[in-house]
Amino acid sequence: MTIRPAYRPKIIKKRTKHFIRHQSDRYAKLSHKWRKPKGIDNRVRRRFKGQYLMPNIGYGSNKRTRHMLPTGFKKFLVHNVRELEVLLMQNRIYCGEIAHAVSSKKRKEIVERAKQLSIRLTNPNGRLRSQENE
């Protein structure tokens, strides 16, 4: 039986397009990552019509759906079995994600314990080798 989230609203993003850096399309040396324009005559900083938009607090997501995955859960990074037990009472709100540095031996233990505690994992199959018949 799969665990379903306690609350699963429709996740609405106010803006899905990336904010790009001013004149990054003009010069190859400028990356597209956002940098706030600081110049005294800058059109973007002065918010002229037709220029790139600047990120501000108004583009933030709804507080209830912020950091929520499409499944309706929020992520919690797990490094060992003990950290998994923190999610015991919150298993309908948070799901575990096994950290990158965890070995495959410990991953098996975490996946096993998560099944017992009925905690959902985002990456239960990560770095688990299947037995090959020789």
From Swiss-Prot:
Alphabetized CDD domains for the sequence: Ribosomal_L32_L32e
GO molecular function: structural constituent of ribosome
Keywords carried by this UniProt record: Ribonucleoprotein, Ribosomal protein
GO biological process entries: translation
GO cellular component: cytosolic large ribosomal subunit
Similarity comment text for this entry: Belongs to the eukaryotic ribosomal protein eL32 family.
Protein's recorded name: Large ribosomal subunit protein eL32
Organism, as annotated: Drosophila subobscura
Lineage: Eukaryota, Metazoa, Ecdysozoa, Arthropoda, Hexapoda
